[in-house]
Amino acid sequence: MDYSQLDPQQVLDALDAVGLRGDGRVLQLNSYENRVFQVFLEDAHEGHSAVVAKFYRPGRWSDAQILEEHSFALELAAAEVPVVPPLVLPLATPGVQLLGTPPTLACGFGHRYGVSARCAGREPELEDPAALRQLGRFIGRLHAVGRKRPFEHRHHLNPRADGQRALTLLLDGGFVPDTERPAWLQACEQALTAVNAAFDAAQPLTTLRLHGDCHLGNVLWRDGAPHVVDLDDAMQGPAVQDLWMLVSGDHATMAQQLNTLLEGYGQFCAFDDRQRALIEPLRTLRMLRHSAWLAERWSDPTFPRNFPFFGTAAYWNQQTTQLREQIEAIAETARMDIGPAARLRHGADEGTANFDGDGFA
C-alpha cells in the first residue's frame, strides 16, 4: 500500500482488519505530516459512530515514540484533561500486529496506524481575558501530568542540536539559491548564536512532557472548554514552549496576554519567569525548523503543490529579513516584564484550584 496513494478502500480494509468496519463513508482530513481520514462505522465502537484513522508517515517516528505519545494521551485522559486519546483496537486479523499496552497502534498493510474518536469544535477566541485564563488552566493541568515523569523516546528540545540540524539540512540539500545564500547564512548563524546564548542564560532549565505544538489551530473549543486532538509533536522541553504560540503582538501586548494565561496556569503549575526570555529564541528556532521541514518533505508531491514559494529567491530573502528581525527581538526581549500574576505562578496549590466553569470538574 503506497503511503502517498492511500485511497478510501485501502483505509476501510485497514480498519476492518482491526475490528472496525466502516459503512463506506470516508473523508480525508487536512494533514501534511500524516494521512488522516474520518470514517463512519457500521456499528458504533465505544459509543463512537465515526472515528479518525491516522496513518503515520514512514520514517517520521519509531514505534516506541508513537506508543509513548499514545501513553501520554491516555494518561492525560485518565487525569480528566480534555484530550482525544487513541482508541484501544479490538482485534487483529492475520497479517496485522497490534502494539502497545493497551493496544493502540496497528502495523499492517505496509503502514502503522491508530484510531481515535472524532472530535468537533471551533478555534478559540482569545480576545476575552477569561478565555485566556481558562486556556491557561487547561495547559497547567496538562503540564501537571507532564511533569510527573520524562519522555524516554520522544524528542527532547535541544536548541543547539535542533538549530544546527536544520541549518545543515538546508545547506547540504542545496535549497538556498547562490544569490541569497551568503546573506541568509550570516543571518542564520547570528540568530542561532543569539538563541543559544538565551538558553544558556536560562539554565538550569526545568523540562517536562509537553504538547509541543500548542497553537490555536491545535486547540478546539468544545462544550465551553479547550480540548487538544493532536499530540504528534509531543516532546520534552520547557513549559514556555506550550505557551508562547498563544500570544501575539508587540512586547507589551504579549506580556499582558502571557500574564493572563499564567493567572490560570499558575493554579496548577509554577512558572519560571526566566523562560519569558525564551519566547523569541523559540520563535526563531521554529522559523528555521519550518524551512528544514519543507526541505525534508519536498519529495512528497503534496509539498511542492501546496508550498510553491519555497526555494525561490524571494522566499530566502524574506527569511533573511525575518532572521535579522529575530536577532533584534531576542536582544530587546531577553527578559520580559514580570506582571501581577507572579504570586499565582509561584504559589500554585493544586489542591485548591478553582475550575471556574472549565468543564474539568
Can you describe what each PLM-predicted range is?
Residues 1-22:
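Juxta-kinase regulatory segment immediately upstream of eukaryotic protein kinase catalytic domains
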Residues 18-40:
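ATP-binding glycine-rich phosphate-binding loop
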Residues 33-53, 86, 193-243, 351-361:
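Active-site acidic catalytic loop and adjacent metal/ATP-binding pocket
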Residues 42-151:
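ATP-binding pocket architecture of kinase catalytic cores
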Residues 58, 109-126, 168-176, 290-309:
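A glycine-centered beta->alpha junction motif in the catalytic cores
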Residues 125-183, 205-207, 307, 361:
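A cross-family kinase active-site recognition segment
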Residues 174, 292-361:
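ATP/Mg2+ or Mg2+-diphosphate-binding catalytic cores
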Residues 239-270, 286-302:
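Active-site activation/catalytic loop segments of kinase-like enzymes and analogous catalytic loops
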